Amino acid sequence: MKVVLFRDGRPGVAAALPGEAPETELSDLLGGEPDVTPLGTRLELLTLHDAERQQLPIRYSLHRIGRAAEPVAGDAVVVRVGADRNYRDADGNDVEAANCYLRPTGR
């Protein structure tokens, strides 16, 4: 499965996850149980559950129309979701859209 990976305060890049169980792989990638935030109709932001409580650094800010920017602690993954709510491979347009939503803070 192809996702958009945000790591170490850098812009998101396309990354392929090996294997058959994307939910397990995403949990392993983030280091624990993910929180899911919808980004429009076809993308979801996955961040580490309780990342702020674990005192991870704020590396990104989430930008959505009509809302103030929200801090995002630690690394993140953006996944594409189909109409059936199953994960799909992210494409170049998804990478571009994900980088509009999630921006490095420069810290």
Place the predicted regions along the sequence by residue.
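Short beta-rich binding modules
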Residues: 1-107
